[in-house]
């Protein structure tokens, strides 16, 4: 995941670990040689349009709106075709009310129409305060949540690890976060909910208590699920 920071002092650029306490809890219950937190890539304002999510100080949110409004008005001034013109006018109306384009319901065709536009507020925008920057761990977790990301855990043997996926991802999609070969050969997902894992006192104990479920590729992953994927090699 890539986070675009619009001049928010105190948020470091580059790759950053998101220290999810649930992985810490899992690491205490299941021995492994290594613990790996999920990572995000933080880029500055000059690369923000390439990011999945935009982060801005609350007092500067209007700057993003004005950037997009200027872009939309410029496009309208070039006499676009009717379909584009109607969509641009819809976006203009929202921006003039200081809203974000991400709040507009669009058809797949409309999204395709503007896929090449350089718009900021079509992405999830997370508004933060200066005080929040003092606790980067909590801030990164909120940014992920507000941007529609969750994680799942894999534990045991060589590594205990948390993997980032979009909320609503299927088990098949989640397996691809680990390796494309696992996704291609997907058979079933062994799933233990995080609460069941903690209450049982570990992965082995949860299995013995009958808390492990076999799920198909269509299963919707839940936040902090423990997963092991069976696949054809």
Each language-model region and where it sits:
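Conserved G1/Walker A P-loop phosphate-binding module
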Residues: 1-58
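Amphipathic alpha-helical transducer elements in NTP-driven molecular machines
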Residues: 19-23, 36-39, 51, 66-69, ...
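A general secondary-structure boundary signal
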Residues: 41-43, 73, 224
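Switch/coupling subdomain of P-loop NTPase systems
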Residues: 49-80
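Conserved nucleotide-binding/hydrolysis micro-motifs of P-loop NTPases
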Residues: 22-23, 47-48, 59-66, 131-134, ...
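C-terminal-of-GTPase-core extension/linker across diverse P-loop GTPases
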Residues: 1-11, 78-220, 225-227, 232-233
């Amino acid at each position: 995941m890539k986070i675009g920071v619009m001049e928010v002092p105190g948020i470091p650029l580059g790759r950053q670990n998101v220290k999810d306490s649930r992985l810490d809890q899992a690491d205490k219950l299941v021995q492994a040689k290594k613990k790996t937190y999920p990572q995000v890539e933080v880029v500055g304002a000059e690369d923000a349009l390439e990011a999945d999510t935009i982060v801005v100080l609350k007092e500067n949110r209007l700057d993003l709106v004005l950037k997009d409004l200027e872009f939309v008005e410029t496009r309208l001034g070039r006499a676009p075709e009717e379909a584009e013109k109607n969509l641009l006018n819809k976006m203009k109306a929202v921006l003039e009310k200081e809203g974000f384009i991400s709040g507009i319901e669009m058809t797949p065709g409309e999204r395709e129409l503007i896929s090449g536009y350089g718009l900021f507020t079509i992405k999830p925008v997370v508004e933060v305060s200066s005080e929040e920057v003092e606790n980067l761990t909590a801030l990164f977790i909120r940014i992920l949540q507000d941007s529609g990301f969750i994680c799942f855990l894999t534990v045991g043997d060589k590594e205990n690890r948390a993997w980032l996926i979009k909320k609503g991802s299927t088990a098949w999609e989640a397996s691809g976060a680990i390796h494309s070969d696992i996704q291609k050969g997907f058979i079933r997902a062994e799933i233990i909910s995080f609460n069941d894992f903690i209450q049982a006192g570990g992965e082995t104990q949860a299995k013995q208590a009958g808390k492990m479920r076999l799920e198909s590729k269509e299963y919707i992953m839940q936040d902090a699920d423990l997963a092991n994927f069976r696949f054809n090699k």
